[in-house]
Amino acid sequence: MSAGAGTGARRLFAGGYTDGSGRDGISTIAFDVGRGAARVVRTDGCAPNPTYLARRGSFLYAAHELDECGRMASYAIAADGSLACRGACTAPFDAGTCFVLPDPNGRSLYGANYLSGSVGCCALLEDGRLVAGLPSRRHEGRGLRDDRQEAPHVHSLSFVPGTRLLAAVDLGIDALVIYQVDASGAIAPDPVETVQVPAGSGPRMVAYHPRLPIAALVNELACDVLVFRIGEGGLQWRIVEQLALPQTPGGDALAAHVAFAPDGRQLYASVRGSDRLVVFHVDERGSVGGRCDVPSGGKGPRHFSLSPDGRFLAVANLASDDVCLFARDAADGAVRAVAHVRVPQVACVVWDA
């Protein structure tokens, strides 16, 4: 079973909060495409609160969101979808790991530490084991809002395509901080560029167009998306568009996630509060517009992911404890809900392929 199967069964992994419940937090989901049905077939995990997952090859990596330390773990994926923990990397001076990113070269694993406002790093061995020792990078400063931006809060990480530049999105200081990473995986002490966004925006996640030098940054607090054109070598980011997202009557909606379709023809974003999945159209030059939106299939769409072939989209609705699966029209990017599955306190969902 895999996410690449045509009309048969596909597999997904969902992670979330366990909050001292004692249960494992990573669920394996079987999605029957033909019947339009999904079910949880097992749960695994070796630490609480695996709130973000990333897959690379035959391994699944998890950010375990803990108040007392930073923690990332590695799991080997078996043929039946079961997970075997290969080890974990704990950083006592970091806290609140909410995002994990494997290096494309397979040698390092990076974590965004929300509570400590830092970027963590550990070495990654071929068998999936993690080795601590690479230094983390800690941000300084604060933002406009006392309730959410009293300190740095690194929320996500990404490699700028075609480079060894690591981009850290910091909600607390309204910035995207870009570091050079060497061949060993070590992060340079000082950033090579800091991209500031409007005060109070609260940036959360960034996505890259699959072909064009375009990036989309979703701002949680401003509830909008900023589209950037990236200069040569992955630097000199320049805002070219600002896209509004659906608000609530009280104006308290929080944007959550953003991703381009695999073919680059659509840009998707999710919004909590209004509980919408938003679709923008992207032209051949990278201009974004033509917004439409649909219900997320639940409440609190914290995260979503598109299947590698672009045929399906899965949404993790944290506030309603479910994953909603959508079929996607390849022609216009429109999505249609086809299945639901209950996953308690789900925060992230990824496809197994």
Question: Each predicted region: which residue ranges?
Answer:
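A short beta-strand motif characteristic of beta-propeller blades
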Residues: 39-45, 85-91, 135, 141-147, ...
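Asp-box/WD-like beta-propeller blade repeats and closely related beta-sheet repeat scaffolds
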Residues: 83-156
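Short loop/turn segments immediately following beta-strands, especially the blade-tip
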Residues: 29-36, 75-82, 121-131, 179-187, ...
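Beta-rich, blade/repeat-based domains predominating
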Residues: 2-4, 47-57, 92-104, 140-163, ...
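Blade-loop segments of beta-propeller domains
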Residues: 40-106
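Blade-level signature of beta-propeller repeat domains, shared across WD40, Kelch, NHL, RCC1
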Residues: 318-324, 336-353
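Short loop/turn segments immediately following the C-termini of beta-strands
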Residues: 17-19, 65-67, 114, 124, ...
